[in-house]
Amino acid sequence: MIPVYEPSLDGNERKYLNDCIDSGWVSSRGKYIDRFETEFAEFLKVKHATTVSNGTVALHLAMSALGITQGDEVIVPTFTYVASVNTIVQCGALPVFAEIEGESLQVSVEDVKRKINKKTKAVMAVHIYGQACDIQSLRDLCDEHGLYLIEDCAEAIGTAVNGKKVGTFGDVSTFSFFGNKTITSGEGGMVVSNSDIIIDKCLRLKNQGVVAGKRYWHDLVAYNYRMTNLCAAIGVAQLERVDKIIKAKRDIAEIYRSELAGLPMQVHKESNGTFHSYWLTSIILDQEFEVHRDGLMTFLENNDIESRPFFYPAHTLPMYEHLAEKTAFPLSNSYSHRGINLPSWPGLCDDQVKEICNCIKNYFNCI
């Protein structure tokens, strides 16, 4: 079976893990945590970065640090992974869904603008599948209305807009290092910000609310969201090779684009002025071929090729369907039903990508 994703672990991961074990520093303190935070901040060119145990708690921590709570509203694209929405609710706030632009799969700035009201506290910009949303326009919109901008960059490490990496536009931004992400720490996440105040609140909230310099004195109801030194060691090794990994993934996307040309689909495009990191290479079937999406996925599976459907829009999920009519977001609904994520891990060889493409061609020759 050719999997959708497999991490690339052929750098210093084993060496750094063994160093942790030999040193005894295997929990939430150690030199690799410090290194990962420092080097990640340098990679992004952002002032502060703090590690956490996964990408979901990164979002919850970021919003908690902003004081988002009951009575607040956070605008979020309905076309996103569910954690983006769940963490808003976990803060006690109300998610307000926004439509996507279309084939970019990114949130519509115009629809975000329409959803702003006196209860709006923040906008969560999600960079879907490695492409950047119109983040500068969202930054300008939030500044105009006095709102926080949160960037969910779980799928977009290395993605950039006009040479500036995503994660540096928001008041606070988050990343995920789950095993299927562009770089992994096994489980893990990062919160980044240029604000001393926001990052200080994150540091205290992620560490049980302890007061610096006064051991076992806590003045906040807080959390244990810390990353282990073991996970950070893997993260450091991965970050050393991030540019190489992203290049491999972009090369894979280009083979897909070339080989699948002429079929009733498009490979997710790179928007003008952006650098797409292609976390997953996504194909979008033409609208009249929507009914063949699941059949194509089954055909791939029968030929030992794993694929994944696009996310379901959040407003169609049982716990959120009361917040909007299921037909309220026609673009999100349509693209969700037409999209497939193909194998995209950096170790895929050209022949494997071409094998996948030939399988897709065979399917369309048979229908």
Swiss-Prot record:
It comes from the Bacteria. It holds the Pfam family DegT_DnrJ_EryC1. GO terms for biological process: O antigen biosynthetic process. Gene3D superfamilies: Aspartate Aminotransferase, domain 1, Type I PLP-dependent aspartate aminotransferase-like (Major domain). InterPro entries: DegT/StrS_aminotransferase, PyrdxlP-dep_Trfase, PyrdxlP-dep_Trfase_major, PyrdxlP-dep_Trfase_small. Keywords: Aminotransferase, Lipopolysaccharide biosynthesis, Pyridoxal phosphate, Transferase. The keyword Transferase applies. Its EC number is 2.6.1.102. GO terms for molecular function: GDP-4-dehydro-6-deoxy-D-mannose-4-aminotransferase activity; pyridoxal phosphate binding. Its cofactor is pyridoxal 5'-phosphate. Optimum pH is 8.0. Pathway: Bacterial outer membrane biogenesis; LPS O-antigen biosynthesis. It catalyses: GDP-alpha-D-perosamine + 2-oxoglutarate = GDP-4-dehydro-alpha-D-rhamnose + L-glutamate. Signal peptide: none annotated. Belongs to the DegT/DnrJ/EryC1 family. Homotetramer. Catalyzes the synthesis of GDP-perosamine from GDP-4-keto-6-deoxy-D-mannose and L-glutamate. Also shows weak activity with L-glutamine. PANTHER family: DTDP-4-AMINO-4,6-DIDEOXYGALACTOSE TRANSAMINASE (PTHR30244:SF34), TRANSAMINASE (PTHR30244). This is GDP-perosamine synthase. It comes from Vibrio cholerae. The lineage of its organism: Bacteria, Pseudomonadati, Pseudomonadota, Gammaproteobacteria, Vibrionales. The gene is rfbE.
